[in-house]
């Protein structure tokens, strides 16, 4: 605004120099007008720039808060899903254990059934063998009886034919018994 004029003679006007450095009423008014202009400019810029910037920052802050809330919610859901899956895994493991236990029980029962069936079959075989032995014994007894009858009839024929005395008769019976063996009579 103010400038110093240099005369063609090369001398400066000292009144102007004093005025630049001196505080007078004009300078105070200019500073007040400039301060008022800066204040008005600040209000206008605040309305035009700072409010949108604040709104932008507030929106960003709200969006970040929503994202944090959403991530906390997602984390909570993930934790809940994890606990649900762990519970399902435990339940499945328990079911597997139950199935294996049931399978073991069935296998053990089947094993016991097979052993019982084998015992029954073995008992039947032993009974059948005992019956066959008894049958063979009775056949042998019948054969021995038939043999004794045949020997007795031969002896009777000899006694009648030769009129054998009593000592001779005892001797013939003893011989017949020796031929058949003592075991036959003991069974």
UniProtKB/Swiss-Prot annotation:
GO terms for cellular component: plasma membrane; proton-transporting ATP synthase complex. GO terms for molecular function: proton-transporting ATP synthase activity, rotational mechanism; proton-transporting ATPase activity, rotational mechanism. InterPro entries: ATP_synth_B-like_membr_sf, ATP_synth_b/b'su_bac/chlpt, ATP_synth_F0_bsu_bac, ATP_synthase_B_chain. Keywords: ATP synthesis, Cell membrane, CF(0), Hydrogen ion transport, Ion transport, Membrane, Transmembrane, Transmembrane helix, Transport. Its main location: membrane. The chain crosses the membrane at residues 31-51. It comes from the Bacteria. Belongs to the ATPase B chain family. F-type ATPases have 2 components, F(1) - the catalytic core - and F(0) - the membrane proton channel. F(1) has five subunits: alpha(3), beta(3), gamma(1), delta(1), epsilon(1). F(0) has three main subunits: a(1), b(2) and c(10-14). The alpha and beta chains form an alternating ring which encloses part of the gamma chain. F(1) is attached to F(0) by a central stalk formed by the gamma and epsilon chains, while a peripheral stalk is formed by the delta and b chains. This is ATP synthase subunit b. The gene is atpF.
């Amino acid at each position: 605004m103010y400038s110093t004029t240099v005369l063609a003679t090369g001398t400066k006007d000292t009144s102007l120099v004093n005025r630049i450095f001196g505080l007078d009423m004009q300078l105070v008014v200019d500073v007040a007008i400039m301060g008022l202009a800066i204040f008005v400019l600040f209000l206008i810029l605040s309305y035009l720039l700072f409010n949108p910037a604040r709104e932008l920052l507030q929106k960003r802050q709200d969006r970040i808060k929503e994202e944090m809330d959403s991530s906390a919610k997602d984390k909570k859901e993930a934790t809940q899903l994890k606990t649900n899956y762990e519970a399902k895994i435990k339940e499945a493991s328990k079911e597997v254990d139950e199935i294996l236990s049931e399978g073991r029980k069935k296998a053990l029962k089947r094993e016991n059934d097979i052993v019982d069936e084998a015992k029954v079959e073995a008992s039947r075989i032993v009974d059948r063998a005992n019956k066959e032995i008894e049958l063979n014994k009775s056949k042998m007894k019948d054969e021995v009886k038939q043999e004794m009858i045949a020997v007795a009839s031969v002896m009777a024929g000899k006694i009648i034919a030769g009129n054998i005395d009593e000592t001779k008769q005892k001797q013939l019976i003893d011989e017949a018994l020796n031929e058949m063996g003592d075991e036959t009579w003991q069974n």
